[in-house]
Curated annotation (Swiss-Prot):
Pfam families: tRNA-synt_2. One of its GO terms (molecular function) is lysine-tRNA ligase activity. It comes from Erwinia tasmaniensis (strain DSM 17950 / CFBP 7177 / CIP 109463 / NCPPB 4357 / Et1/99). It is an enzyme of class 6 (ligase). One of its GO terms (cellular component) is cytosol. This is Elongation factor P--(R)-beta-lysine ligase. It catalyses: D-beta-lysine + L-lysyl-[protein] + ATP = N(6)-((3R)-3,6-diaminohexanoyl)-L-lysyl-[protein] + AMP + diphosphate + H(+). With EpmB is involved in the beta-lysylation step of the post-translational modification of translation elongation factor P (EF-P). Catalyzes the ATP-dependent activation of (R)-beta-lysine produced by EpmB, forming a lysyl-adenylate, from which the beta-lysyl moiety is then transferred to the epsilon-amino group of a conserved specific lysine residue in EF-P. Keywords: ATP-binding, Ligase, Nucleotide-binding. The gene is epmA.
Length: 325
């Protein structure tokens, strides 16, 4: 603690006042649309299995748990919120803290604010329109552009991501200056993600938000596969001014398929030398009981506020970043 002013907030009080106004505006947006605000636990006995996500882990040893209970800070409120959907909540949203034991920097903090909402009986496109409405209201930006994952690659990299083989993907990576890295990578989806980050993200969403939809089925996560094209998933992401803002799905409702995906994730984790994670059987039971067809999205509030305030980094809009807490 060599910085004598390190007790001070990361953000200015003026920015924190503006942040509070944006939070109130978000709540009004959903209140006007009849969406219920909910609160769910920040900890769980299960966690995400995604090989690219790293949760914080703790252990409860209080009265009634002499043997101890392993708990994980939530990387997103998704699993609990889907249980509410299955219980008949109707449309819901949540503003909450989420935690990822990963990066810190200009656009990352291990503790961050998430806006997540779910719309029963919405398809992916209807939810995209609602996200666009929120962005226009908060950011005062132009209506977004939309393009498929395939269109994005064809437009900016002149390659079809749904049919290209690994050799062709490596050739494009070479042109982008990442040939050595690509040559060491055997996973096709990782190669696609590399090309997306290097060749697509910098080119989209410069003047207005960009929605990219229909990611490859192999990157479906918790999304349904498209009934029109089984090569792609009903998944979208939102980018604006070089920042990924949101990730949304038409939600998978088949518990058996979801279990298979969780188990496949854990096999990938084992192959990568990572610990396998406990599967959320409560979520699987909720899906089995009958979660309604829904679409949902998770949006990074700190990044949204950063864009709204034209700030340079997250520390300009967060009261205390991890280096000051």
């Amino acid at each position: 603690m060599s910085d004598t002013a390190s007790w001070q907030p990361s953000a200015s009080i003026a920015n924190l006042l503006k942040r509070a106004a944006i939070m109130a505006e978000i709540r009004r947006f959903f209140a006007d649309r009849g969406v219920l605000e909910v609160e769910t636990p920040a900890m769980s006995q299960a966690t995400v299995t995604d090989v690219h996500l790293f949760p914080f882990q703790t252990r409860f040893v209080g009265p009634g748990a002499a043997a101890g209970i392993d708990l994980y800070l939530m990387t997103s409120p998704e699993y609990h919120m889907k249980r509410l959907l299955a219980a008949g909540s109707g449309p819901i949203y949540q503003l909450c803290r989420s935690f990822r034991n990963e990066e810190m920097g200009r656009h990352h903090n291990p503790e961050f604010t998430m806006l997540e909402w779910y719309r029963p009986h919405y398809d992916m496109y209807r939810l995209i329109n609602e996200v666009d409405d929120l962005l226009q209201q908060v950011l005062e930006c132009a209506p977004a552009e939309t393009l498929s994952y395939q269109q994005a690659f064809q437009r900016h990299l002149e390659i079809d991501p749904l049919s290209a083989d690994k050799a062709q993907l490596r050739e494009v990576a070479q042109k982008l200056g990442a040939g050595d890295l690509a040559n060491r990578e055997e996973d096709r989806d990782t190669l696609l993600q590399l090309l997306f980050v290097l060749g697509v993200e910098p080119e989209i969403g410069k003047e207005k938000p960009a929605f990219v939809y229909h990611f490859p089925a192999t990157q479906a996560a918790l999304a349904e596969i498209s009934p029109e094209d089984h090569r792609v998933a009903e998944r979208f992401e939102v980018y604006f001014k070089g920042i990924e803002l949101a990730n949304g799905f038409r939600e998978l409702t088949d518990s058996r398929e979801q279990r298979q995906r969780f188990e496949q994730d854990n096999r990938k984790r084992a192959a990568a030398g990572l610990p396998q994670q406990p599967i959320d059987t409560y979520l699987l039971d909720a899906l089995s009981a009958g979660m309604p067809e829904s679409s949902g999205v998770a949006l990074g509030v700190d990044r949204l506020v950063m864009l709204a305030l034209k700030a340079e980094q997250l520390s300009d809009v967060i009261a205390f970043t991890v280096d000051r807490c």
